[in-house]
Amino acid sequence: MSIKKLILAASILTTLALTGCGGKGAVQPSGVSTGDVNAKIVFDNDKVNADNVDGLSVSEREVKITKPGMYTFSGTWNDGQILVDIGKEFEAVLVLDGVNITNTKSAPIYIKSAEKVKIELADGKDNVLTDAEFYEFEDPQDNKPNACIYSRDDITIKGNGNLTVNANFNNGIGTSNDLKITGGNITVKAFNNGLKGNDSVTISGGNIDITAEADGIKVENTEEPHKGYVNITGGTIKIRAKDDAIDSVRSVSINNADVKVSVGGKDVKCEGVLNIAEGCLGKLEE
């Protein structure tokens, strides 16, 4: 059953700081320890060809990763899921080297357990991910995954390649923790929210184009005082949203970026502090 979007009450804007919107200053993520595994997986419509390595199991509809490492994917997969389940103390890198993955029952990429996962978009390659309109959950009480790319833990998207996310069920790219984007040409079309980080969304680079039936970017952690923020320090972002462009519970900061929005709700809705540099946020004219 599809997840219905929630319409939040009007928020109070407490602080608006206007500063200069100067040159680019992308923040680079820290290094990731990925273990010894370095495997290639090639999709061929209904077939999956993969290196025979420990920690990687393959079936017709699932590629399951159980050990940290670097995993490179290419080709077209008509119906399947990349499942990462390596444990909360480990990290992995998923390299999308020209993939087109559809899942007719769930999410194409589901990070079930990991400390952190990086999704790297290979230079110049086109990648397309499309999820189901209705999900079949392993645990109906859990209702996870709930995004076309979904992670229970931290996720970073980087690189210079292209990524198109067609989210027919709920959110486009979602995580229960922190979502970071440092690069890539990313297009998201979402039935609900475009980018959803429960704890935070941080963008330091890339060209991002979001079309969402609800909010463009959404963060909603109210339980931890140091969480619940959106921080944009670089990149070019276009947001078309039927609700709000950016919705965050604690703070929204936009500097050294070009953000253009076309919305049915607010450009920015925030229950806390706003720090938006002059000239960094404007209307999208098309």
UniProtKB/Swiss-Prot annotation:
Positions contributing to Ca(2+) 3 binding: D215, D243, D244, D247
MF GO annotations: calcium ion binding; cellulose binding; galacturonan binding; xylan binding
Intracellular or extracellular location(s): Cell membrane
Chain residues that bind Ca(2+) 2: D154, D178
Residues involved in Ca(2+) 1 binding: R152, D153, N177
Membrane topology: Lipid-anchor
GO terms for cellular component: plasma membrane
Keyword Calcium found: yes
Lipidation (S-diacylglycerol cysteine): C21
One Pfam entry name: Cthe_2159
Function: Binds cellulosic and pectic substrates. Displays no enzyme activity (in vitro).
Subunit structure: Monomer.
Protein name according to UniProt: Carbohydrate-binding domain-containing protein Cthe_2159
Species lineage: Bacteria, Bacillati, Bacillota, Clostridia, Eubacteriales
